[in-house]
Amino acid sequence: MPSLPGHEIIGTRMVGEMPPVELVDMWIRVTSAVVKHGFEIRYRDLEPPRTGTFNGLHIVLDPDVDFEMQCFILLHLFGHSVQWVAPALQPKLKFLQCSDDKEEFLMHLRDYEFEAARIGMRLLHSVGVTQLDQWYSDFVETDWRYVERFYREGEIPPWEECRASSCPVITPCDIPELEHREVEVRFAF
């Protein structure tokens, strides 16, 4: 079945169904903005299940991950990178590192994940990409379901079982001042 141009698609798009032209335009704008915020973007073959890493100075993507997922991972890891190098956000990170209570940890983890998502949404808007809010929000919720299941069940769930659609749209937040420094490598899976 031939795919329709983006302007002919009616309704929301599901995660995994973004038209390539929109992805390429977004990619060009977002990669430029990530670099202008002081982060280097690299490609490297990562050990599965890792799909991307960040260390406060650069964001690494696995080239074997499909392009739509790379777009999301870059936005999301940009958000996490900002969290780790923005002095204003440092106090929030301690809750992730010192909780023995699983439910409390998951609550803080959700806050952390969605704050990164709000930062990613701000980056999208700052480069003039405002028509993909629902796509990004659905990807964020899908990612959260995936991460939460991993922490609850102890194994990586099938991505398809976590897919979400028509989720509440993520509200962007400001990108605070950054002080770039190397931090412990963290990864997406």
Segments (PLM) and residue ranges:
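Long, well-structured alpha-helical subdomains associated
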Residues: 66-69, 121-189
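Anionic, Ser/Thr-rich low-complexity intrinsically disordered regions
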Residues: 50-53, 89-92, 107, 180-188
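Post-HEXXH active-site segment of zinc metalloproteases
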Residues: 84-118
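Active-site scaffold of zinc-dependent metalloenzymes
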Residues: 8-70, 78-85, 89-90
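N-terminal secretory targeting signals
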Residues: 1-3, 189
